[in-house]
Design a protein with these regions (language model features):
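Helix-loop junctions and terminal segments of transmembrane helices
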Residues: 45, 50-87, 141-146
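Membrane-interface helix-loop junctions in multi-pass transport and translocation proteins
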Residues: 1, 151, 158-194, 202, ...
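Interfacial/gating helices of multi-pass transporter permease domains
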Residues: 3-12, 30-53, 78, 117-122, ...
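Short membrane-interface helical motifs at transmembrane helix boundaries
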Residues: 96-114, 169-173, 232-236
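Membrane-interface junctions at transmembrane-helix termini in multi-pass inner-membrane proteins
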Residues: 128-160
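Interfacial segments at transmembrane-helix termini and the short loops linking adjacent helices
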Residues: 36, 101-132, 179, 205
Length: 252
């Protein structure tokens, strides 16, 4: 009786490992190809991103009990509605949070760390870019766990992680810069954390997958809007201390 449970836990653990691996492995590569200083800079930025992931992840978990109840009672139409609406709400909230952080990244790094680190704000933007999209995807992915479609997700996650490592190593050896490396990592994270869960979700509810993609596009559009507005506010105010930064974030 325990064997199916252990198999599922194994696949879930592998998928979680792949997610963390893609988000964190860049530190190892950067230390080897760019040096310890840049590793420390990116480590600080990634840590800030981890806080945002934790916050938005908690919001997504709030919908899990409702989805579980609907699935256990075989109310599949309700499950689809809860999934789509829940993912949209989570996507909008995380888009608002991450859009503001991205737009004000230069000021945040200046106040949080120092002016020298603030010059690497583009790195923070790339790191924050993936969070709203993957948070949306992970909420949709709860359905895959309910349907026990974790094996295919885990296998494809490992494939994406392996391809990401292979491409990164080749391009780094050819002299690829830091921003290019981070962009490749962001693409891998979005493929693994958003596109893949939705593709597997299609196996359970193919009739609603179009709506899932449309809602994701809406969240992404809102994310871009918040980012652009905050970036403009940041360019006007240029917060130099915590008080001014808080005012800037509130205005944004």
């Amino acid at each position: 009786a325990m064997k199916p449970v252990l198999k599922m836990l194994t696949w879930v653990s592998l998928s979680s490992f792949s997610s963390v691996f893609i988000y964190k492995i860049d530190t190892l590569f950067i230390n080897n190809y760019f040096g310890l200083y840049y590793t420390g800079v990116l480590g600080s930025i990634s840590e800030f991103g981890a806080y945002c992931i934790s916050l938005t992840g908690v919001i997504g978990l709030l919908f899990r009990p409702l989805m579980l109840i609907a699935y256990s009672e075989k109310r599949h139409e309700d499950l689809v509605k809860i999934t789509i609406n829940g993912a949209y709400i989570v996507g909008i909230i995380s888009s608002l949070l991450c859009g503001i952080v991205m737009g004000a990244s230069a000021s945040i790094l200046h106040v949080w760390l120092n002016d020298e680190i603030s010059h690497y704000s583009v790195w923070m933007m790339i790191k924050m870019l993936i969070i709203p999209i993957t948070t949306y995807g992970s909420t949709v992915g709860i359905v895959n766990n309910l349907w026990n479609h974790v094996k295919s997700f885990s296998i494809w996650s490992l494939v994406i992680a392996a391809v990401y490592v292979g491409i990164s190593l080749i391009l780094l050896e050819l002299g690829m810069g830091m921003i290019g490396f981070l962009v490749i990592g962001a693409i891998a994270a979005i493929l693994q954390g958003a596109i893949l869960p939705i593709m597997i979700y299609k196996e359970a509810y193919p009739q609603s997958v179009g709506t899932v993609y449309i809602q994701m596009i809406k969240c992404t559009s809102f994310f871009i809007l918040v980012f652009v507005v905050t970036l403009w506010v940041d360019s006007v105010m240029e917060a130099s201390n915590l008080f001014m930064l808080m005012i800037e974030l509130v205005i944004s």
